[in-house]
């Protein structure tokens, strides 16, 4: 593949790529997003994410050759950029000098990328996040979900964009492989889950709710809902879920951080065989 040299910050190719860092609307309209860093870009390539363009500096080409090779094999266009251009494409203080413009993966009805292996397990489990707006929390949750084998997530309401730079970095590439579906309202999501024979549980900081440790995740299909960092779940979600569950707490803390609560929920699913890492 021919590699083009870019020496000017005024390059339209660079400007168009940089716009993908700025707004979710830009990414959505283009159907593209930016991945930054040698490891993340290589992960995108290994996950069969379509790579529209790769940008790299000469220093990065030498330092990260093993990571760049699979990326360049898949990239439709490749550009060697001057060092002073790299900050335009970066969301970090010290960019490595490796960037990819990726196409948002095509997804099946269950949210899994078409390039991913189908989910053939007898029980299906979903983590639902409602109005989770902190990119760091979102990235951590996605990373934890993949690590524990829970492959399906639903994002409801005003959740942040999973293709935002901080989410991508925090997820360690999990976005490329997880099943992710978005819903405008809790009602929309609940209707779909109900049609798929999935029981919805609202996670709340209320000792009167059912302890999550007693839920038989090893049988049936379950969805656990996690709410906004500051306000928790909406009344609509709580009222229409089949039951309320809580994470037993000691001490004086009133609630968990959203990503911490999600991690505990995901572990409970896996501990009871729901996640699937110990069951294929």
Positions of PLM-derived features:
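Boundary-proximal intrinsically disordered activation/regulatory segments immediately upstream
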Residues: 1-67, 159-160
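Amphipathic alpha-helical repeat scaffolds
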Residues: 37, 133-141, 256-261
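RNA substrate-binding interface of SAM-dependent RNA methyltransferases
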Residues: 46, 111-208
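Glycine/small-residue-rich loop that forms an oxyanion/phosphate-binding "nest" at active or ligand-binding sites
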Residues: 71-98
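Structured adenosyl-cofactor binding patch, chiefly the S-adenosyl-L-methionine
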Residues: 144-148, 162, 167-175, 235-280
């Amino acid at each position: 593949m021919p590699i083009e040299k870019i020496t000017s910050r005024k390059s339209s190719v660079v400007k168009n790529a940089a716009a993908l860092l700025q707004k979710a609307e830009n990414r959505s309209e283009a159907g593209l997003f930016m991945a930054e860093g040698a490891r993340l870009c290589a992960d995108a390539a290994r996950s069969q994410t379509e790579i529209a363009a790769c940008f790299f500096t000469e220093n990065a080409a030498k330092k990260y050759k093993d990571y760049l090779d699979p990326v360049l094999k898949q990239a439709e266009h490749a550009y060697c950029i001057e060092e002073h251009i790299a900050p335009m494409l970066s969301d970090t203080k010290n960019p490595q000098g490796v960037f990819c413009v990726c196409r948002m993966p095509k997804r099946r009805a269950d949210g899994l990328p078409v390039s991913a292996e189908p989910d053939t397990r007898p029980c299906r489990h979903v983590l639902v996040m409602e109005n989770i707006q902190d990119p760091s929390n979102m990235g951590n949750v996605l990373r934890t979900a993949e690590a524990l084998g829970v492959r399906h997530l639903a994002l409801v309401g005003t959740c942040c964009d999973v293709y935002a730079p901080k989410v991508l970095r925090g997820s360690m590439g999990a976005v490329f492989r997880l099943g992710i579906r978005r819903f405008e309202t809790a009602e929309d999501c609940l209707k779909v889950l109900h049609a798929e024979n999935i029981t919805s549980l609202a996670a709340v900081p209320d000792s009167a709710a059912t302890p999550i440790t007693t839920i038989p995740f090893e049988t049936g299909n379950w969805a656990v809902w996690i709410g906004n960092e500051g306000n928790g779940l909406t009344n609509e979600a709580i009222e229409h879920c089949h039951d309320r569950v809580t994470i037993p707490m000691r001490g004086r803390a009133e609630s968990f951080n959203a990503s911490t609560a999600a991690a505990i929920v995901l572990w409970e699913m896996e501990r009871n065989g729901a996640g699937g890492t110990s069951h294929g």
